[in-house]
């Protein structure tokens, strides 16, 4: 029977001895004998023994002890600074160490895996075979086939298979150090400069909870942990030294019968890891006086047993042939060895090379072990269809084994080690894999695959490499591992993953893998997805109960959902349970006490008080529990069609959504749990189960991205945080924001429906990485409805919002940002134009009689009658807007305003109105009114009420100010008066005065025709000048010119001018006459502080050039040009105008080329250009004032005089002519007159004459006999308008 020894003082030996369970007052345990009713595991009790609770649940909950041992709840491996809430509401903090990984403990806790096929326990467990002879890890049962023990109660065991579920406990604890060194290395600071060694024990002995007996021993569900501190490193006992510890006084879990052999762990500060100190031996004392004794790990004995199972085979890159019980390498042959128990050993291969099997090989309890960083091939000799069977395959780090034989079909292949197993042919058996990589290189490589432990990877290297069935023959147990699709597509009905230790990935960066999950009923995938993957859930017909519920991390290229619901949520943290079965229907006299009910009852009162019934309900998780693990979902695009998307609690989602005929619910209150989570894999590891429950569970959820939706609906629930940071469009898709939700749109949002909000809605511009904020536009055709008291509607930071707002509740509205909130903000020029210089612009009506509005640096364009309870305006503008003769009224109970403007429209009888019912206060506010013109002979003044406020309101609230309207300065004449018990501001008339600056801006715009004419003039005679330099014949030519110019008032322009043409030479008596035709295209841009725009011009002309033998010449040209103009003005409300115009040109130039030498010359010249420029006229209204701006047709006459000098340089096959010129260009006629007309009368601005000095340098080159190339640079100075820089290049081909 399994003993937990009690340690007593012996007078005979003079020391402590281990006393058996049969002695008086010693706690003990055995198997209850098989009765006729049933076989059960029980505890032998003695009436004269007092049993203390092994788990004290007066302070901590029962579940906490189980969570720790099973790495559930907060006790995830590696977690630090862990604390739990005690029943009195205080926190209990565990040592500031990472939580150990207890996966190396066997399910019943009586033994501990140390890796490979080895486990440790205590020697006296041999008397109870149910304790450690059979060990379960995950879904695999292992059997002890050999062991070695010591007199100090230590036992090292050899198991029948390599353990795949764990890499085993670290056994590097050095007990041979002196005590102080051990304390220094493994101790924890406890204050006052002292260190203590603190550790954990994991076991499932005879379990009780504060007097609640379970009658259970070796029950996996009841695996629990103890927290202790070591009190004696070398307690002298029978058989040798033991380590003595005492349990923590708060988190108290005493050692009991059945805990013999359970692992004890301490932390190695030097290596930063947990190590196995030893195995539990026995106890002395009871309750708070209990001391537990630990047998230290014995590395010497462990190595001795391992050596019994090692046969080294050094292949050294040769071939090892195995057959007939022998191994042959070259000329050397050795027998396959067995140990003294006639058990096969592990064949430990080294050196790399080939292994050839001549026949089936059954190593029994021995396996294949391969060393690190080598390449091996295992194959059959010839074409033999041979198989291998054994304890498993262990491949060292960096090594790859090409496996080209089969494993025995009546057994499961166990694979461990960090190296890779490349399976080349189908195995027709099952695989259990833990560490390293298994590459599947054949169709249906294994019937089923069991993936355990976490670090392992299964990689696809062939089509249909997995098995068949709903789960494709692959099962991921606790901590799972990776499935690498490696560029292959894979379809599942369900993925058999028990927790988030499972990841499906694609390491192939060039070929995307499609992962299809086609569950026909509700299903939760607990694992993760990452890599180059597209995730699909497509059904042929719409099914509302075929939800794909994702509660692991998802990072995919895209997700596509059709005809089925998709749920993204966090995961309710898994916890330990007290019994796998939900109820115990067996009578107590046969099956023992129903401890689950007793625990629930014992903790009921504190659970009712703390609302923590979920802690005692024997469920893996509960919808009401507060601890949920947040999951991240990342994708580029999520496409859903005829489907629904739910983003529930603890989901953090980023990506763009495209939805058609679908429902989107962000912050869905419905969540899903799986009562078998963490326990989904059953049997031998190749079956899967789920028990899905749903209900209300509200927690924070997040979505960041954009939504493009058509014919659907979007609901955003409580505690949802939504950030729309890319453009979103909702077409026939209603958006509802519920109370408690927080939605921020930082990019444009357009909807053809309405937006209902009971939560917080914020519309804002987008902040770029440079710190600059770019504007965003928001348009809701159906408007915005605020449905809850306290609902917040905020627009700020370059938001331009359009859509009516209404609310019957006490909502809060805010437009704009105070200067202190955006002092670091940089605004783009586009934003300043779009927002009229304000931080925020809103256009629409507000009907919210119970709501308040705060405006800071904001513009409100009031488009309909509006009503508010309170309006607070600072540095803002309320601009009444609407159709012709449709006026609006803004009614508020209280108005507080400062440094703001209210701009109204009126006719001779009506006007927009501001009505303040209860209180109007503030100062330094402008009251502005659009201009109106009185018609006929009505000489009476106006009498139009604009503002009505409570009686005796200060007259200083509003003041008037001169506005520039049209080309005039307009001052409305407004008086305040007490009328009908109210303070009223009344418009009585206007005062208008011409504004010279506005007229100057208009004149600058209208002068564009003259500057365009001048640009064409400067390019008019270029071709004829070239003819004199090239001594050419008939030919075709092309020219491109680019230049910039500037004038006063901030005017600047630039142009690109292209000419093409052809001409012919006529040799006459005493002269050469060239005649030709030209086509031109000009693209010019011009602007100033007041306007900007462009002109595109096309033209055609004829020219002639007569060059006399004497050196005299005459050039003539005629040309027509058509102009298409588009200009945008920022003055007088002109806006953008498109118009066409044209011009005619007639030019003549005379000169004389005087040759100083044969290659140098001087050329005086004179030019006269006459033309016609068409006029234009614009008529419009600016703030109610009629405006006209016109310039008439005019005929410019421009003269130019100057002198050019040049010199030719030539060689055998080339000639270059360089030239420079200086001239003066001047207007003989003033350019056109501009006529401006507005309410202050007509203004005529006469055109002025201008003149400028011209300078140019250039050259022409003969590249070949019939090819010429020219280049020229120009600029002008001393004019009102000057060419800053110009360059032209020409090319001619002579026939």
Curated annotation (Swiss-Prot):
Superkingdom of origin organism: Bacteria
Key words of the record: Cell outer membrane, Hydrolase, Membrane, Periplasm, Plasmid, Protease, Secreted, Serine protease, Signal, Transmembrane, Transmembrane beta strand, Virulence, Zymogen
Signal peptide: 1-52
Domain (Peptidase S6) ranges: 54-304
PROSITE patterns: AUTOTRANSPORTER, PEPTIDASE_S6
PTM statement from Swiss-Prot or TrEMBL: Cleaved to release the mature protein from the outer membrane.
Active site per the UniProt annotation: 124, 153, 260
GO cellular component: cell outer membrane; cell surface; extracellular region; periplasmic space
InterPro entries on file: Autotransporte_beta, Autotransporte_beta_dom_sf, Autotransporter_pectin_lyase_C, OM_autotransptr_brl_dom, Pectin_lyase_fold/virulence, Peptidase_S6_dom
Gene Ontology terms for molecular function: endopeptidase activity; serine-type peptidase activity
Record site feature (Cleavage), residues: 1018-1019
Function: Serine protease with enterotoxic and cytotoxic activity. Internalization into the host cell is required for the induction of cytopathic effects. However, the serine activity is not necessary for secretion and internalization into the host cell.
Protein name, entry field: Serine protease pet autotransporter
Organism for this UniProt entry: Escherichia coli O44:H18 (strain 042 / EAEC)
């Amino acid at each position: 029977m399994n003993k937990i020894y009690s340690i007593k003082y012996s007078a005979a030996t003079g020391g402590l001895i281990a006393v058996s369970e049969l002695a008086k007052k010693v706690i003990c345990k055995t198997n209850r004998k098989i009765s006729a009713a049933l076989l059960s595991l029980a505890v032998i009790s003695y009436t004269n023994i007092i049993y203390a609770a092994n788990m004290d649940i007066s302070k901590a909950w029962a579940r906490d002890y189980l969570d720790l041992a099973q790495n559930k709840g907060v006790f995830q491996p590696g977690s630090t600074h862990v604390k739990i809430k005690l029943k009195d509401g205080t926190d209990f903090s565990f040592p500031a160490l990472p939580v150990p990984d207890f996966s190396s403990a066997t399910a019943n806790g009586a033994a501990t895996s140390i890796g490979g096929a080895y486990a440790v326990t205590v020697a006296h467990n041999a008397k109870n075979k149910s304790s450690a002879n059979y060990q379960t890890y995950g879904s695999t049962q292992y059997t002890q086939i050999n062991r070695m023990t010591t007199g100090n109660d230590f036992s090292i065991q050899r198991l029948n298979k390599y353990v795949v579920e764990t890499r085993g406990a670290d056994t590097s604890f050095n007990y041979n150090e002196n005590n102080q060194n051990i304390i220094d290395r493994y101790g924890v600071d406890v204050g006052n400069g002292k260190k203590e060694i603190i550790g954990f024990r994991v076991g499932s002995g005879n379990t009780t909870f504060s007097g609640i007996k379970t009658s259970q021993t070796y029950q996996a569900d009841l695996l629990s942990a103890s927290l202790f501190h070591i009190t004696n490193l070398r307690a002298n006992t029978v058989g040798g030294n033991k380590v003595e510890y005492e349990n923590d006084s708060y988190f108290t879990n005493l050692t009991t019968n059945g805990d013999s052999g359970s692992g004890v762990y301490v932390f190695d500060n030097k290596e930063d890891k947990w190590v196995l100190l030893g195995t539990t031996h026995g106890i002395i004392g009871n309750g708070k006086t209990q001391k537990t004794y630990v047998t230290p790990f014995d590395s010497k004995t462990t190595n001795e047993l391992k050596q019994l199972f090692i046969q080294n085979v050094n292949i050294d890159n040769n071939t090892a042939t195995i057959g007939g019980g022998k191994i042959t390498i070259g000329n050397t042959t050795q027998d396959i060895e067995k140990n003294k128990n006639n058990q096969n050993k592990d064949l430990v291969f080294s050196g790399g090379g080939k292994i050839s099997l001549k026949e089936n090989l059954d190593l029994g309890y021995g396996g294949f072990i391969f060393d690190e960083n080598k390449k091996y091939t295992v194959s059959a000799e010839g074409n033999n269809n041979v198989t291998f069977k054994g304890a498993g395959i262990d491949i060292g780090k960096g090594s790859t084994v090409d496996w080209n034989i089969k494993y025995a079909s009546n057994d499961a292949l166990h694979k461990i080690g960090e190296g890779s197993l490349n399976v080349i042919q189908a195995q027709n058996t099952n695989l259990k894999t833990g560490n390293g990589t298994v590459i599947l290189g054949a169709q249906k490589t294994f019937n089923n695959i069991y993936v355990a432990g976490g670090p392992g990877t299964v990689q696809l290297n062939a089509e249909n490499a997995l098995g068949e069935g709903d789960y494709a023959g692959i099962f991921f147990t606790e901590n799972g591992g990776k499935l690498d699709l490696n560029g292959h597509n894979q379809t599942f009905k369900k993925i058999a993953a028990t927790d988030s230790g499972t990841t499906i990935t694609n390491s192939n960066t060039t070929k995307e893998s499609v992962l299809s999950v086609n569950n026909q009923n509700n299903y939760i995938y607990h694992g993760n997805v990452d890599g180059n993957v597209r995730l699909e859930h497509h059904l042929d017909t719409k099914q509302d109960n075929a939800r794909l519920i994702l509660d692991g991390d998802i990072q995919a290229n895209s997700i596509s959902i059709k005809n089925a619901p998709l749920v993204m949520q966090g995961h309710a943290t898994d916890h330990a349970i007290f019994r796998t079965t939900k109820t115990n229907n067996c009578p107590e006299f046969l099956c023992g006490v129903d401890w689950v009910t007793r625990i629930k009852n014992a903790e009921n009162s504190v659970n009712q008080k703390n609302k923590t019934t979920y802690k005692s309900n024997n469920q893996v998780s509960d919808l009401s529990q507060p601890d949920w693990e947040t999951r991240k979902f990342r994708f580029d695009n999520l496409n859903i069609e005829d489907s629904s998307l739910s983003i529930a609690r603890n989901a953090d989602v980023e990506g763009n959504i495209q939805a058609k005929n679908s429902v989107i619910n962000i912050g869905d209150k419905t969540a899903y749990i799986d009562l078998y989570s963490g326990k989904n894999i059953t049997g031998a590891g190749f079956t899967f189960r789920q028990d899905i429950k749903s209900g209300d569970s509200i927690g924070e959820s997040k979505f960041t991205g954009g939504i493009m939706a058509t014919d659907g609906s979007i609901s955003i629930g409580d505690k949802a945080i939504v950030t729309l940071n890319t453009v979103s469009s909702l077409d026939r898709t209603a958006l509802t924001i519920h109370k408690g939700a927080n939605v921020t749109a930082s990019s444009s949002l357009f909807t053809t429906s309405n937006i209902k909000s009971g939560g917080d809605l914020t519309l804002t511009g987008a902040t770029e990485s440079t710190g600059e904020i770019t504007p965003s536009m928001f348009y809701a055709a159906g408007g915005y409805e605020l449905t809850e008291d306290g609902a917040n509607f905020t627009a700020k930071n370059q938001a331009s919002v359009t859509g009516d707002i209404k609310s019957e509740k006490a909502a809060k509205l805010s437009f704009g940002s105070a200067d202190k909130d955006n002092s670091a903000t940089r605004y783009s020029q586009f934003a300043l134009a779009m927002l009229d210089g304000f931080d925020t612009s809103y256009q629409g009506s507000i009907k919210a009689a119970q709501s308040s509005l705060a405006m800071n640096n904001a513009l409100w364009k009031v488009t309909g009658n509006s009503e508010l309870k309170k309006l607070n305006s600072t540095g803002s503008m309320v601009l009444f807007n609407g159709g012709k003769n449709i006026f609006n009224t803004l009614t508020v109970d209280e108005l507080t305003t400062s440094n703001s403007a209210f701009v109204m429209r009126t006719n001779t009888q009506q006007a927009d109105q501001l009505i303040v019912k209860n209180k109007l206060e503030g100062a330094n506010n402008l009251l502005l009114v659009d201009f109106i013109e009185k018609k006929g002979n009505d000489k009476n003044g106006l009498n139009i009420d604009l503002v009505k406020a409570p009686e005796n309101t200060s007259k200083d609230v509003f003041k008037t100010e001169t506005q520039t309207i049209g080309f005039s300065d307009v001052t409305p004449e407004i008086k305040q008066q007490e009328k009908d018990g109210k303070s009223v501001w009344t418009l009585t008339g206007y005062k208008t005065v011409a504004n010279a600056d506005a007229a100057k801006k208009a004149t600058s715009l209208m002068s564009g025709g003259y500057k365009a004419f001048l640009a064409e003039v400067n390019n008019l005679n270029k071709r004829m000048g070239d003819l004199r330099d090239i001594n050419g014949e008939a030919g075709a030519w092309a020219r491109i010119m680019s230049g910039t110019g500037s004038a006063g008032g901030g005017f600047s322009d630039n142009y690109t001018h292209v000419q093409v043409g052809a001409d012919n030479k006529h040799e006459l008596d005493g002269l050469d006459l060239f005649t030709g035709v030209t086509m031109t295209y000009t693209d010019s841009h011009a602007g100033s502080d007041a306007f900007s725009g462009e002109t595109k011009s096309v033209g055609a002309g004829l020219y002639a050039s007569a060059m006399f033998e004497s050196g005299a010449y005459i050039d003539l040209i005629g040309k027509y040009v058509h102009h298409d103009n588009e200009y945008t003005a920022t003055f007088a409300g002109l806006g953008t105008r498109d118009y066409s115009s044209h011009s005619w040109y007639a030019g003549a130039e005379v000169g004389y080329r005087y040759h100083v030498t044969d290659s140098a010359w001087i050329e005086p010249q004179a030019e006269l250009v006459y033309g016609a420029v068409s006029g234009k006229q614009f008529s419009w209204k600016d703030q109610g004032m009629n405006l006209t701006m016109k310039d008439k047709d005019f005929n410019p006459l421009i003269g130019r005089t100057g002198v050019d000098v040049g010199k030719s340089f030539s060689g055998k096959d080339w000639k270059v002519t360089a030239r420079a010129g200086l001239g003066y260009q001047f207007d003989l006629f003033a350019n056109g007159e501009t006529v401006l007309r507005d309410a202050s009368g007509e203004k005529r601005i006469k055109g002025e004459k201008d003149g400028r000095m011209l300078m140019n340098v250039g050259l022409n080159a003969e590249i070949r006999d019939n090819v010429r190339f020219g280049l020229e640079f120009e600029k002008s100075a001393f004019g009102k308008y000057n060419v800053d820089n110009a360059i032209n290049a020409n090319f001619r081909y002579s026939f």
